[in-house]
Regions:
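Generic, well-ordered alpha-helical segments
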Residues: 23, 34, 53-60, 74
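Conserved GNAT-fold acetyl-CoA-binding loop/helix
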Residues: 41-66
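Intrinsically disordered, low-complexity regions
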Residues: 29, 52-55, 69, 167
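A short helix-loop-beta-strand connector motif used in the catalytic cores of GNAT acetyltransferases and
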Residues: 52-53, 66-81
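Acyl-donor (CoA/ACP) binding surface of acyl/acetyltransferases
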Residues: 1-30, 34-44, 79-192
Length: 192
């Protein structure tokens, strides 16, 4: 198998309404603004998104962007920032994570800027990332894992053509020590 770092993966994904591209040096302010606006909503699901519990600073957002840029090049992770074409605004962050290159398979993850919810942007991005995984990584499956209580995320999975494979009961602990269930969805190339 070819070392993943040698794969020539496109660094831009275009959909009818969105541009997805890896984070770049200098994207920190836009990311910080979107995160700051969205923290109350994101923190409802700390069991799935533990990183949002930490203070989100301009510096930490810029560090995420620089690390994301490096990780994309090294193929350790494939993060993307999602921009609305019409207005040019950062509307979401999404990516292909925990890629098992030998299989190959990947997990799609995302969060949406609060002011951009309800527009179908995340569903559009998840479909595009799934197709990217099937076409460029030759993935045989793409997983989407979410907290069972995150109904909006479950709807994204279903609208994007993912099938619920199972619910892992008492799979995570939330910061308040409550047990949470995790939904495991998957999509396959023949469903793309």
């Amino acid at each position: 198998m070819l070392d993943p770092i040698l794969l020539n993966l496109p660094s831009c994904i275009e959909t009818p309404r969105l541009t997805l591209r890896p984070p770049r040096t200098g994207d920190g302010p836009a990311l910080h603004q979107a995160l700051s606006e969205s923290l109350p909503e994101l923190r409802r699901f700390l069991a799935s998104l533990p990183w949002v519990a930490a203070e989100q600073t301009l510096e930490s957002a810029e560090m995420f962007c620089r690390n994301g840029e490096a990780n994309f090049v090294s193929r350790k992770d494939l993060p993307f920032l999602v921009f609305e074409k019409r207005a040019g605004n950062l509307v979401a962050s999404a990516g292909l994570h925990r890629t098992a290159w030998q299989t190959p398979k990947s997990e799609v993850g995302y969060w949406c800027r609060t002011s951009a919810t309800g527009n179908g942007f995340v569903t559009e991005a998840v479909i595009a990332l799934s197709e990217y995984a099937f076409q460029h990584i030759r993935a045989v499956r793409v997983e989407l894992i979410t907290d069972e209580e995150n109904v909006a995320s479950c709807r994204v999975a279903e609208r994007a053509g993912f099938v619920l494979e199972g619910v892992l009961r008492n799979e995570r602990r939330a910061p308040d020590a409550s047990l949470r269930n995790t939904c495991v969805y998957a999509r396959f190339p023949n469903a793309a």
